[in-house]
């Protein structure tokens, strides 16, 4: 979406992607959720002492 609309602000892109996400079924969301869980586990293994500090 960002490549198709290079002048669009990140906040607008996020809103549109969020709206698209809400339209997906649970089955369509599942691969993304599974990948996020996998990546979280990898990150925790590689950086066990990591603490988020904004």
From Swiss-Prot:
Residues 1-54 bind DNA. It is found in: Nucleus. Pfam families: HMG_box. GO terms for cellular component: nucleus. Its main location: nucleus. The keyword Protease does not apply. The keyword Zinc does not apply. One of its GO terms (biological process) is developmental process. InterPro entries: HMG_box_dom, HMG_box_dom_sf, SRY-related_HMG-box_TF-like. SUPFAM superfamilies: HMG-box (SSF47095). It comes from the Eukaryota. PROSITE patterns: HMG_BOX_2 (PS50118). One of its GO terms (molecular function) is DNA binding. Keywords: DNA-binding, Nucleus. SMART domains: HMG. PANTHER family: SOX TRANSCRIPTION FACTOR, TRANSCRIPTION FACTOR SOX-2. This is SRY-related protein CH3. It comes from Gallus gallus.
């Amino acid at each position: 979406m960002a490549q198709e609309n290079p002048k669009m602000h990140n906040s607008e892109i996020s809103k549109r992607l969020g709206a698209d996400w809400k339209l997906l079924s649970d089955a369509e969301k599942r691969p993304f959720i599974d990948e996020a869980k996998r990546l979280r586990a990898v990150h925790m293994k590689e950086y066990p002492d990591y603490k988020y500090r904004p």
